[in-house]
């Protein structure tokens, strides 16, 4: 099975690190985000990668090359102008239309969730599956009793009643009929698939790490988790 890594964005919120480096090549705990992703997916048998590139595209090709040094094969789809994640994925049609199904990963996600759990969702007319994770609160929570005495502090808990897009998807090639020439998956594709009941989710409750690297704070938090895991190992 193949995996597409969506890496064409500019990563503006991660500046100044992305002034001269595309976000997926920014290092987290000693290696680029995209290398974390390749190593993660390889653990589940994925060796064929398609990277959609645009901003500073030559940096990807220079750093990753053919993928041989990672025990993988990497192809590149170049966006000559920004197309968004939906348009970027549509550009990869010629490399994916013969596949039974394929993974798609946002280029700024670091995680260890099991992608194979999505496979069972593509049954019948369903053509897309989305990984979701519990919403992490950006703030600490304060609890009080009936007389307004504070009784407990909980630092940035996970809110399990609400779920967010984890940036990992599995699609059948039929999805290309719904993809825009320009635009994002979140705005242009997913609402369409949801309206016709062709999109399902797997809710991931237990994992060591899931982090979307949008800001310097996200990067710092991801590094803390990764280094903590290395120490515990």
Regions found by a protein language model. Name each.
Residues 10, 107-109:
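Active-site metal-binding loops of divalent metal-dependent hydrolases
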Residues 20-35:
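Short catalytic helix/loop segments, enriched in acidic residues and glycine
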Residues 113-139:
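Conserved donor-nucleotide/metal-binding helix-loop-beta segment in metal-dependent transferases, i.e.
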Residues 46, 103, 110, 119-120, ...:
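Catalytic-core segments of class I nucleotidyltransferases/pyrophosphorylases
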Residues 1-19, 42-44, 198:
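N-terminal nucleotide-binding beta1-loop-alpha1 segment
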Residues 29, 55, 80, 113, ...:
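Short beta->alpha linker loops
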Residues 25, 141-144, 201:
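A structural signal for short hydrophobic beta-strand segments in well-ordered beta-sheet cores
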Residues 2-5, 31-106, 117, 178-181, ...:
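Conserved N-terminal catalytic core of the sugar/cofactor nucleotidyltransferase
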């Amino acid at each position: 099975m193949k995996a597409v890594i969506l890496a064409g964005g500019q990563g503006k919120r991660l500046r100044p690190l992305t002034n001269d480096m595309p976000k997926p090549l920014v290092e987290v705990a000693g290696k680029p985000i995209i290398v974390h992703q390749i190593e993660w997916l390889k653990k589940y048998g994925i060796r064929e990668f398609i990277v959609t590139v645009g901003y500073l595209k030559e940096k990807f090709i220079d750093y990753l090359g053919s993928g041989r040094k990672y025990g993988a094969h990497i192809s590149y789809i170049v966006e000559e102008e920004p197309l968004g994640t939906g348009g970027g994925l549509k550009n990869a049609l010629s490399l994916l239309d013969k596949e039974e199904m394929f993974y798609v990963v946002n280029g700024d996600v670091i995680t260890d969730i099991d992608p194979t759990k999505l496979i069972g969702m593509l049954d019948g007319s369903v053509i897309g599956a989305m990984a979701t994770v519990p919403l992490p609160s950006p703030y600490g929570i304060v609890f009080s009793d009936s007389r307004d005495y504070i009784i407990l502090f909980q630092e940035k808990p996970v809110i399990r009643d609400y779920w967010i897009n984890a940036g990992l998807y599995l699609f059948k090639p039929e999805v290309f009929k719904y993809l825009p020439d320009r635009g994002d998956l979140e705005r242009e594709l997913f609402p369409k698939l949801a309206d016709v009941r062709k999109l399902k989710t797997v809710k991931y409750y237990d994992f060591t790490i899931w982090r979307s690297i949008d800001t310097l704070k996200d990067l710092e938090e991801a590094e803390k988790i990764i280094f903590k895991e290395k120490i515990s190992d």
